[in-house]
């Protein structure tokens, strides 16, 4: 997690894997799961090509379909699209998610990873 960057906490509901992580003027740059002892487990960001291999998409609306119940546990990666954050695997317990943000660049400027 970045020092000095805006951070937002989300209490995860077991079985819910979509989070509205919008913060006007900012983009998501990192996520971590916080356990009961307040230890942070960073999540790896994946690109669309890797996420599509794991999760089937609905042809009618283009949204990812809910994975089967068997595929639940401690999230290890996330996919960020628009203002929605998708966790993989689906959370099995009520952990806390910490999300780091960075300001968007000027309009039309390419986004850079730090």
Which role does the model predict for each range below?
Residues 1-114:
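Glycine-enriched, solvent-exposed interface loops adjoining structured elements
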